[in-house]
């Protein structure tokens, strides 16, 4: 049967992981986006590069009163979206950059602001503006990897680049710096996880997620961010579940939540990061340090905020700023709670519930010098671009997720009617690799890739360089389902694919309610089901949770305008590493009723390739079901076999890590 992926509506396009075709999107993407891209690139080119003598100050060109309040955060410091003290200035810059009526006025104003504010803050605010201005549709949001490679590559690698640059050995070939040879430190308990923690694409995704879902966003900036709070909950929950799965792949126990701020922090961490232009060195955190009060933030305030949120969850309602009760025990409760816990400016009562998530990043980032007694810089947890490198990130976010799970526990488990899709039965699910030689076995391996760093940084004074980095990858595979439609008419379905490790760190199989906390989303796509038997085949590279390889390693010029948000889990990390002997992994497929699940018939053309984690940009989230359905609520049945309805199926897969190294794509 022809199971063509539906591409006529927003939900169809986004959920299938397939972008709308260029002809249908031509009206949404500005015609001159390539020219605008060059102007944006020129604007950001000196953010992290030396400003040369030909720089011309733009003071006096516009009304200075418009710029009042700018420059609060000193230049050469790291801007943190987590630090609320930076919010007023960042929000003002965003508002100023959204205000101009034309692109030319926007660029002119941005050029003026650029030299008045902190460089890092400017990049963030500019990125938010580009992502949300109508005249920038199709223009790439500046890739943080390109602007700040020294936030993603260890100082040892930057030093090697600088050595080659100083030699001037650029002749007729771009030099390749091998970042895979950075010496191992087997005393570090996180050594086995650095491929995940320090992955360029994963950390870039986290940064850009916070660009398109800024905590400082308000409806007056250009509309409501649909289900933003729920997206905060779900995307970060998925990051923790993926990290736990990588730990189990390496025979390490799952991460423990950091929930008592009077206890020593188990995880020590050294970022090995220095911003070369400014000399900003991200602080090292020894194992066993204890979080201390900050000058304006005592730990008791964090306990108070957490307890107030927990009281609201147990009562089933929050107290709004105008003292009314806001119910939580409904479909929108998780969204409201996400805004409160993050806490974004959309929180129902920021004064009362505080800023639990963000300020925990701040207090953790300043843990080695909380009073600034010794002039130490902040740690990786302070910066959105670097925080996911730190193992503490996952301990902290597991604590945050436990708060959300307290809310989910108050909701009734799904009943069979809510789970079932009448007349639809999933008969089989097989996972096949591209060459078709074996079934339900997928192999993973190391992939070497080349990351290009442009000329002009303090460490690339003579020309551009290529850096060879190592990351995880997997062979191409397909989901093959046999689905029976017992009705006499065609049905439209949404196929939801999840996966979870089967055994815990002791080798014992999980009961389903415990296993659901480790479930990672793999894909979500739509199908037409004709009456009778249907064969459904979906490739892994069309996943609705991932961004393509080129989003991270390709040239900006080669990216499609529809991929301009740079948000999405790296496609090469869709699966966990697995084990040499094979990791037992269960893949679940659930087919639900698309006619009930779809939100609208509006087509999406921008940033639609990772909609499950990143949402549909400037539009409604294209799925009415709660994120993570049906694993988002308590499951009383001990096994999937007792839980499932006819429209669900599970199959066991072996993920085998080969240890092989594949060479970089293309010529060196």
From Swiss-Prot:
Localization per record: Secreted, Extracellular space
Keyword Signal: yes
Signal peptide annotation: 1-22
GO cellular component assignments: extracellular region
Superkingdom assignment: Eukaryota
Binding residues for Cu cation A: 206, 210, 236
Entry keyword annotation includes Metal-binding: yes
Covalent S-S links between cysteines: 567-614
Job description of the protein: Hemocyanins are copper-containing oxygen carriers occurring freely dissolved in the hemolymph of many mollusks and arthropods.
The protein, known as: Hemocyanin subunit D
Protein's organism: Scutigera coleoptrata (House centipede)
